[in-house]
């Protein structure tokens, strides 16, 4: 039985982009007779109040996309001790080191950058001696990075096809824990998906480039990776990427204007799952769902669809 998951970050109310990901995760799992679990990705508790998490649970139930468990959902903010064990495993093997670089140093014009604008860490702190680490620790708490190999990690995405990266060249040593002690997304998501028994992950294509480093972490930690399906991004009619700041596209406002079936039907139409924006239920869509129906390029919402 396939096990998918929702993994929302409760930094605001859900918008249509979040909903598209949840809908396709639900359809992908249910079309295989599977289940969908819920995990709340609230590592940064200052930005992720529980009230937003409660609203997400309510929104999903109202739409007919309620998770199959667990109850209550898994909260990443409750799992620091678990992440610490896996962090310590990598540290014991000499793969983790402290990084004292400031944000301005990391984003200096001379720093190598990816094509998407992300900084590739140059390894500035990788070779610090114990004495240098002790001296720098007097004035600045370090973040912690993991050292990646000069190795190509490739995989076949269930929707986007072949993707690969050379970790050293295209990714660089990445954060496992912030200076304030909060564990990084890259470590937490790998540990959680493995321990929850998730075997398929549906998420946005903005996370496609995170997958090689996560697959490497799965391997290094002796964990079984899921099958990945990366989605096109959902854009507003003017080409903007939807965000939680787009109040008019939030579920809070959409619930006041439409029924659940109307929202699902309009979104299914935008995703290529049906020929018109007629009202639909997730259960009806699951009976005919196939990944070949979903575009690979970004989806622009037709004007006045919502």
Residue positions per predicted region:
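Non-catalytic terminal extensions that flank enzyme cores
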Residues: 1-13, 31, 36, 134-135, ...
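Short, surface-exposed, polar/charged, turn-prone segments marking secondary-structure boundaries
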Residues: 32-33, 64-68, 102, 126-127, ...
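Active-site neighborhoods of enzyme catalytic cores
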Residues: 52-53, 57-163, 167, 278-306
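N-terminal Rossmann-like or analogous alpha/beta NTP/dinucleotide-binding catalytic cores
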Residues: 1-114, 205-206, 210-223
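Active-site cores that bind ATP or allylic diphosphates and position pyrophosphate for catalysis
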Residues: 104-243, 250-254, 303-306
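Noncatalytic linker/hinge segments flanking ATPase motor cores
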Residues: 15, 77-83, 137-140, 186-191, ...
